[in-house]
């Protein structure tokens, strides 16, 4: 529909990833894009230091596999990286409507205003502009007794037991 029926004459896209990334997952994505879109992707593995240089400094890439761990329990820990003026905006994404929604959310504590604004920003980022393609989120493996109550997981694989108790 976009000028490349069945992916014909679509340029091969290069997808950069480090040796530490989950190679089988990216190979599965490569296969899905080929089967469903007719698009060829070349996977290029790099050592971490050159990858970071290409990704953050040179910004010489079309697609790259990266990850981010939220520092706090709020959507802005992820969405805030993509405002046009953020030093973390490695994609160089710029969208005034997105920036405006994030700004609106940052100016209030009223969740009835914040959350709809953040949902609109997320829609712009992922659905409308397709700047990022979230593939998965990490869920650490945990063995926990059903009797242990009120344990809270916080970012960076830490657990808060301050209010925990054992049910009899």
Describe the role of every protein-language-model region.
Residues 19-23, 95-96, 110-114, 145:
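Short, structured coil/loop segments at alpha-helix boundaries
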Residues 24-28, 32, 50, 74-77, ...:
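Extracytoplasmic/secreted proteins, especially bacterial periplasmic and envelope-associated proteins
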Residues 34, 56, 106, 125-126:
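N-terminal cationic-hydrophobic initiation segments that often serve targeting/anchoring roles
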Residues 4-10, 54-59, 80-107, 137-168:
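Short, solvent-exposed loop/beta-turn-alpha elements that line the ligand-binding surface or hinge
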Residues 128-131:
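Short, charge-rich amphipathic alpha-helical segments embedded
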Residues 1-70, 111, 137-140:
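Ligand/substrate-recognition segments at binding pockets and active sites
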Residues 71-74, 78, 87:
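N-proximal short alpha-helices
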């Amino acid at each position: 529909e976009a000028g490349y029926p069945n992916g014909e004459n679509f340029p091969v896209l290069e997808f950069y990833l480090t040796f530490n990334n989950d190679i089988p997952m990216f190979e599965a994505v490569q296969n899905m894009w080929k089967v469903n879109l007719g698009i060829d992707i070349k996977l290029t593995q790099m050592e971490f230091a050159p990858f970071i240089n290409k990704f953050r400094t040179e910004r010489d890439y079309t697609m790259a596999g990266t990850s981010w761990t939220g520092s706090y329990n709020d959507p802005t820990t992820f969405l805030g990286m993509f405002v046009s003026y953020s030093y973390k905006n490695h994609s160089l994404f710029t969208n005034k409507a997105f920036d405006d929604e994030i700004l609106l959310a940052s100016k209030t504590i009223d969740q009835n205003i914040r959350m709809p604004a953040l949902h609109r920003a997320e829609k712009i980022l992922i659905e409308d502009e397709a700047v990022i393609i979230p593939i998965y989120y990490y869920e650490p493996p945990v063995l926990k007794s059903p009797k242990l109550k009120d344990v809270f997981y916080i970012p960076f694989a830490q657990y808060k037991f301050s209010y925990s108790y054992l049910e009899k």
